[in-house]
Amino acid sequence: TSSMTPGEVMAMCRDKGIKYLDIGAAFGMVELHYMGGVFQHTTFRRDTYPTGGGHRPRAVSYSGDINEDAFRRDFTVNAIYKNILTGRITDPTGGMQDLKNRLLRATSKDPAVIMGDDALRIMRMARFASELGFEAERGTLEAARACAAGLADISPERIREELDRILLSDAKYGIPGGPYRGLELLDELRAIDVIMPELAKGRGIAQKPQYHKYDVLHHCFHAVDCIEPSLTLRLAALLHDVGKPAALQATGCMYTHDRLGADIARGILERLRYPSAVIRDVTALIRNHMFDLRTEAKENTIR
């Protein structure tokens, strides 16, 4: 990142024979392909968001001021600058100390401004917590909870991208327990109620203690942590018991939750714009996850 405008960056690339892609010049972003690496350059800028939760900048203007650029960002740990020529660190928001403390803190003294401007930052906070094993600072956490309803205004594709990263977070840096950590944070913030209200219905629904230690919702979270890092498998694990609340309400028991769950999961995945192949495979796994592999089920259970 620097004060160079996208036009200046692209002109420099043409002059030096460096391949580049315009990945969002309106937001100051240019992708550079150099010496086998891929780098993103972002121009220092200031953002203006619409009132009422537009979640996308209404206006972007370039700035030569690194401090303006720093305080428009989401978290202090994402607002640390290093001069690649001199090695000098510039840290306007105190991100280095938060990095040492493994803490996610909003750049603004009023975290509600950061979360309210773009509610996807709530999902990003959960993703960073799951990938890095960081904790969220209390004020930032409270602001995220207060702004969670704003996730309803975020595009399904943006929600899906962050959810996928949370589900596969332990594969990023090898930190165990990442998916559960991220999902539990989404539950604590009640963000899960907005992005997957059908799944949130499992909160507090107890199960037979001889088979299940957790309520339906947290059983699903733990199941994600216990399966290999495949997106299809982890989506299936997350949603495999999503039909239990509906089955319980309809029949007073949880039989048929696999079939009900497959239909409910399809609705969730279609709403989040997952590819048809992913929807097909995930719903097939959910529909058949009660299959009696050991042929030990009693006749009345099969009925």
Q: Which residues does each predicted region cover?
A:
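Catalytic cores of the polymerase beta-like nucleotidyltransferase superfamily
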Residues: 1-303
